Regions:
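Active-site neighborhood for divalent-cation/phosphate handling
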Residues: 75-141
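Helical "lid/coupling" subdomains associated with nucleotide-phosphate turnover
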Residues: 221-334
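Phosphate/pyrophosphate-binding loops at sites that engage ATP/ADP/AMP, CoA/4′-phosphopantetheine
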Residues: 84-97, 196-205, 257-270
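Gly/Thr-rich phosphate-binding beta-strand-loop-beta motif of the actin/hexokinase/Hsp70
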Residues: 1-32, 137-169, 186, 216, ...
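Phosphate-binding glycine-rich/basic clefts of nucleotide- and phosphate-handling proteins
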Residues: 161-246, 269-278
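Structural motif
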Residues: 7-10, 100-104, 149-151, 272-279
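Conserved phosphate-binding loops in N-terminal lobes of ATP-dependent enzymes
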Residues: 11-100, 223-227, 231
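Conserved, well-folded catalytic cores of nucleic-acid-processing
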Residues: 60-67, 86-90, 119, 189-197, ...
């Protein structure tokens, strides 16, 4: 039976099939009287109609009552159920699945996720630690490594022990260091640029604020490659245009990225999750870190599926995988 991987991160949930196809959905749901919107459609309303937006249901997966939730939505677990149900409807049918989960997911969250999956008639064959999966196929210089997993609301710093296997050792959650925090910094910086250059404040109008929110990642990614870019936002039929400079973006984000460096050890390899890839290299270089490939963890887990399948009706959390580069090196040496 084929296995589908489901990678849980509130930036985006990813489905990865054995044929290498990847399907993604931002970890956002928008609820209103007309029903539910998911993923990109929900994200497109987060700033223009924020009251109905939910983006913490994966990072805070629990059964704490949601205030003013619509009928049938009691808590974050209900919203996560609907999001997974939507993904299955779009890209299913799914039967046998393996979940790749953040290192800071508690037993309570894993238990809830298992219950949600079983309610959706999914056969869960196991859970795999995301940090372990990302480092298992990397060439590393030290016996200790740290993996920074960027989420919407936090960055999880995992410490791993490296020998013939990659083993999870511990994790630390850095609050106010997630993609939303970086995004708020970027949005405020760009808004200041519009005020200075075009005498236009995009944050004073819900529609233009939503435009800015939608465009920010693309503009940051462009500045990763270019020293300057020209951008524009439209309001009431008028286009406001300005120039953005990479040096100024780096200056705006440097304090936030400096805070990420605080828990990092000098004697450890540091690897960043692929969600950091949109930011300028100068910011990443300050962390003395390397980027993980976009599908590195998923490819690694898929290659290890026989080892990861749970038996005897016990669904296990795997926090240790063979270090592929170590194994390859030993094979090349004939041992």
């Amino acid at each position: 039976m084929s296995v589908t991987l489901i990678d849980i991160n509130d930036v985006e949930v990813r489905l990865y099939r054995e044929d290498g196809k990847v399907f993604t959905s931002p970890g956002v749901v928008h609820l209103d009287s007309d029903g539910m919107l998911f993923g990109a459609d929900a994200r497109a309303r987060l700033r223009s109609n924020p009251q109905g937006g939910f983006d913490k249901f994966w990072s805070q997966l629990d059964e704490v009552p949601v205030a003013a939730g619509p009928r049938g939505i009691r808590h974050h677990a209900d919203i996560a159920y609907r999001h997974l149900q939507h993904l299955i409807g779009e890209h299913g049918p799914l039967k046998q699945v393996l979940f790749v989960v953040p290192s800071d997911y508690s037993r309570a969250k894993l238990s809830l996720l298992l219950g949600i999956a079983q309610a959706l008639q999914l056969e869960v064959t196991g859970f795999v630690d995301n940090a372990v999966a990302n480092l298992a196929c990397r060439t590393l210089q030290h016996q200790t490594a740290q993996f920074l997993d960027l989420g919407l609301h936090r960055t999880c710093v995992s410490r791993l022990e490296i020998n013939e296997r990659v083993r999870f050792a511990s994790s630390q959650t850095l609050e106010r260091s997630g993609k939303n925090h970086f995004g708020d910094i970027v949005i405020n910086w760009i808004a200041d640029c519009f005020l200075d250059q075009a005498r236009f404040d995009p944050l004073q109008d819900a529609a233009s604020e939503q435009q800015l929110f939608d465009q920010q990642d693309g503009w940051v990614n462009q500045l990763r490659k270019s020293a300057h870019i020209n951008v524009g936002l439209e309001q009431h039929g008028r286009l406001h245009e300005i120039s953005l400079a990479r040096d100024e973006l780096i200056r705006a984000l440097t304090p936030a990225f400096t805070a990420l460096a605080a828990p990092l050890a000098a004697s450890a390899d540091v690897v960043l999750s692929h969600h950091f890839a949109i930011y300028p290299q100068e910011l990443l270089s300050n962390l003395n870190a390397k980027l993980a490939g976009k599908t590195t963890a998923l490819e690694t887990v898929m290659a290890c599926v026989p080892e990861l399948l749970s038996t005897a009706n016990e669904v296990r959390l795997c926090r240790s995988l063979p270090h592929a580069t170590m194994t390859a090196g030993r094979n090349e040496n004939g041992s």
